Amino acid sequence: MWKFIVILSCKLTNKLSKLTGHAGSVIGGRVARKLDKNILKKIKLPKYVIGITGSSGKSSSTELMYNILTKNNYKVVYNKEGSNTIDGIASLVLNNSRLTGKLKSDVLLMELDEKFMKYVFEYITPTHLMITNITRDQPP
């Protein structure tokens, strides 16, 4: 029952955020993780979970992978808004899950910020990981 409430809270928070003119792609995940920090461990994920990370090229690579997968008849859930932090991934997963906790897709495709990747991996283990590049893109 608690999982149901947490998932519903995420969905409603994101809808309310969008209604008030915000993107609504992160806040629901933040609320859900405050209610249950392990909620992502309780979601039934699809057979394929793909993470894409790197210093640059994440969004383009994710979009390209999405197009390839959908053209091959896979139902894909991915963070097209680019919300690639732990709360953004939580929103993505929970917003696309049934209230029973099953993700509604064949593939979960996640664009991951390289700094937040380790936090996501505490809760979601990808079956595949693509690293676009490793370069210093910020001053030390």
Label every PLM stretch briefly.
Residues F4-P140:
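Phosphate-binding loop of NTP-binding sites
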